[in-house]
Amino acid sequence: MTIKLITFDLDDTLWDTAPVIVSAEATLRQWLTEHAPNLGGVPVEHLWAIRERVLLAQPNLKHRISALRRQVLFHALEQAGYDHAQANQLADQSFEVFLHARHQLEIFPEVQPTLEALANHFALGVVTNGNADVRRLGLADYFKFALCAEDIGIAKPDARLFHEALQRGEATADTAVHIGDHPGDDIAGAQQAGLRAIWFNPNGKTWEAEHAPDAEIRSLNELPGLLARWHRGA
């Protein structure tokens, strides 16, 4: 097969996400304790309740996780007694604190060598439901585009997100491959859009979904060899 475009998931594909989110949440909490003491110790359950109310009022934020988080912070701050202007300012500042901390992550060591090798032969893109920014991580030069669910309000596994990626990558589904860790969002989503899908499975989990991925890898450094075999028709 001829491959022109390779798209990548980000979270839990190019780095381990859970530790950095836990750390970012802790950093946010500490900042709020210092700069918004009225809110500082609010229970997490209270924030989740606000989140549900925000989504009921603004369902279009479902896939815009940055805007949603900022709205939750704003409403929590208002309810804690800050006036509208203060709540707006503190929400902006606290969200930026979270976003900065969210990018203090450790990219898997094989990521950059693999991207460098692939970028010499293929167009590379990002398709993510998260709010990580490859520009903040020094990875932007490898990618022709980075498509986030927030950009168009549609999230994986919706095929429309992958169709948008094909347009931006100037490719057709039969010449594109997607790599990701999530059986539904990444594998099923890509396959439903007509792409081949490679399951990134570093921990050797058992595949349990009905339709198997087109291939499985434990490390991203397996990608160049796998794609070369596909190109040869092996």
Language-model-detected regions and their locations in the chain:
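Asp-based, Mg2+/Mn2+-dependent phosphohydrolase catalytic module
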Residues: 1-6, 18, 85-87, 112-234
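N-terminal helical cap/lid subdomain that shapes the substrate entry/recognition surface
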Residues: 2-109
